[in-house]
């Protein structure tokens, strides 16, 4: 149905999806162009109920301090740290963005959404220990990673993570890195606070329980979006000069619906994740870290297990996982027909090719699906030897849609990270992919602005405002210990985080960002 012109609302910006990405973009735009009218459409009954919900996140506060898959080894055995630096720099932009929002009163009570939580890498086995030491040494070349400490001493490790050491074989060889400046972030809380603030502003409207039915282009180049209220069945329409699709797993199908040729390049493959969780306060209070392991031999790096301290719904809990799950849904609250309905004549071959080329990944997923409760509990005990089965339950987290892009040579390739897909005329943009996801929402949305509103970003007005919000904009913190220290101190104070360690100014930095190596695509698959 083409809604009658009289019923069609007109806005400058329409955002589809009420998660961390859309809300972050809306806050950016409201800062830069307060007079623009905006509408946000969300199919569920509240914002941040899909992947932005804390219980549906696979992990948070990603800043490459502990995730070993962001520092691959090259064929000569050298550890490449360029991806880790890129992700850490991006996270510092997020910290600055949130700090500004706290100062403006948009975000309230920093402890409700961000808390200091040390990040650790925790490995055993001679090869893994050797790799971790090499990784630690390589990262010391960057001021961003200077506070990291390395230890193979059981007594020291027990001081950091007593829970992981009690009941462990004293002769087991271990190696860990411990970084005190890590954080745990609740993106559901940030999203709710962002949208709550936007709702108090003139020119912003939120439509909940509203599912997009159709997206068509108007003669004047704007977008006509029709949506249905799932509660009462009423249908509405909005015309927007700019349309952003930040609908998580639902983004691919909506981009396909728009008919833009750029969307034909992509296919999506859903991967879910489940976690073991304990809410026992006695246990939770004994563990204060996000401890990342290394993928078992033969398993792809996406399977890296972690024992995570999280603050969810105001209480401290521990999550262990992820264990891969499979469903043809693209969203936790999606349809089992999602995978089939997103498959087209354009993307079926790339998907098939990736399935053939990534056979170990397929094998891994199949193996994960066959795990029993006992298998999962045994995996937990390698990290927490004294865990009691009755204190843990299995929780199904959110769905991630791994993106596959058409490739002239290979037919199709798995794509790393998140990808901004925009039309040639830059009137519509969508976000595909999953990792590192929400942790880098502020810089990813800044990238959307640079892509879509290129001319405006170049104006002195936008430049000045962006630099006010993100003081380090346009510079590389990695190049300067003084700039890194300044940014840490500023954001830690505003966000009420632990006082950052002082970087030793006598150490020379620079040249740490080795040239990126081509890492395996599954390195970045987020569960």
UniProtKB/Swiss-Prot annotation:
Pfam families given in the database record: Mqo
EC number: 1.1.5.4
Group of enzyme by EC: oxidoreductase
Keywords (A to Z) from UniProt: FAD, Flavoprotein, Oxidoreductase, Tricarboxylic acid cycle
Keyword Isomerase: no
Family the UniProt entry places it in: Belongs to the MQO family.
Protein's UniProt name: Probable malate:quinone oxidoreductase 2
Organism: Pseudomonas putida (strain ATCC 47054 / DSM 6125 / CFBP 8728 / NCIMB 11950 / KT2440)
């Amino acid at each position: 149905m083409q809604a009658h012109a009289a019923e069609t609302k007109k806005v400058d910006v329409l955002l589809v999806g009420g998660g961390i990405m859309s809300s972050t973009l809306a806050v950016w735009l409201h800062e830069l162009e307060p007079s623009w009218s905006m509408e946000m459409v969300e199919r569920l009954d509240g914002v941040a109920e899909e992947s932005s919900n804390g219980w549906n996140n696979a992990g948070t506060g990603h800043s490459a301090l502990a995730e070993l898959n962001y520092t691959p080894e090259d064929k000569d055995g050298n550890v490449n740290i360029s991806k880790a630096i890129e992700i850490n720099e991006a996270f510092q932009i997020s910290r600055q963005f949130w700090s500004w929002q706290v100062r403006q009163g948009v975000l309230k009570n920093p402890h409700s959404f961000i808390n200091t939580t040390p990040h650790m890498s925790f490995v055993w086995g001679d090869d893994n220990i050797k790799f971790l030491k090499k990784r630690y040494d390589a990262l010391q070349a960057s001021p961003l990673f200077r506070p990291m400490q390395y230890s193979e001493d059981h007594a020291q490790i027990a001081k950091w993570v007593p829970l992981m050491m009690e009941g462990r074989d004293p002769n087991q060889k271990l190696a860990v890195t411990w970084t005190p400046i890590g954080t745990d972030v609740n993106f559901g809380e940030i999203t709710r606070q962002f949208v709550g603030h936007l709702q108090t502003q003139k020119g912003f409207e939120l439509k909940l329980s509203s599912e997009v039915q159709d997206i068509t282009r108007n003669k004047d180049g704007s977008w006509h979006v029709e949506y249905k209220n799932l509660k009462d069945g009423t249908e509405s329409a909005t015309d927007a000069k700019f349309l952003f699709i930040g609908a998580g797993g639902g983004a691919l199908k909506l981009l396909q619906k728009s008919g833009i040729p750029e969307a034909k390049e992509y296919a999506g493959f859903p991967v879910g994740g489940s976690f073991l969780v304990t809410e026992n306060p006695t246990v939770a209070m004994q563990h204060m870290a996000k401890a990342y392991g290394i993928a078992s031999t033969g398993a792809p790096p996406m399977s890296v297990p972690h024992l995570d301290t999280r603050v969810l719904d105001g209480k401290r809990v521990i999550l262990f996982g992820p264990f891969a799950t499979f469903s043809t849904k693209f969203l936790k609250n999606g349809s089992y027909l999602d995978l089939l309905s997103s498959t087209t004549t354009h993307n079926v071959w790339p998907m098939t090719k990736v399935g053939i080329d990534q056979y170990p990944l397929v094998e891994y997923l199949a193996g994960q699906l066959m795990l029993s409760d006992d298998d999962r509990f045994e995996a937990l005990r390698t990290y927490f030897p004294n865990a009691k089965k009755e204190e843990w339950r299995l929780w199904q987290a959110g769905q991630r849609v791994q993106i596959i892009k058409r490739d002239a040579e290979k037919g199709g390739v798995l794509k790393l990270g998140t990808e901004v897909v925009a039309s040639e005329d830059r009137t519509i943009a969508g976000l595909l992919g999953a990792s590192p996801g929400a942790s880098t929402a502020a810089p990813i949305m800044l990238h959307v602005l640079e892509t879509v509103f290129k001319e405006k970003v170049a104006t002195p007005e936008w430049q000045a405002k962006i630099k006010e919000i993100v003081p380090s904009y346009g510079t590389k913190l990695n190049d300067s210990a003084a700039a890194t220290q300044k940014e840490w101190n500023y954001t830690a104070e505003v966000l009420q985080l632990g006082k950052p360690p002082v970087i030793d100014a006598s150490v020379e930095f620079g040249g740490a960002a080795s040239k990126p190596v081509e890492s395996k695509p599954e390195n970045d698959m987020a569960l």
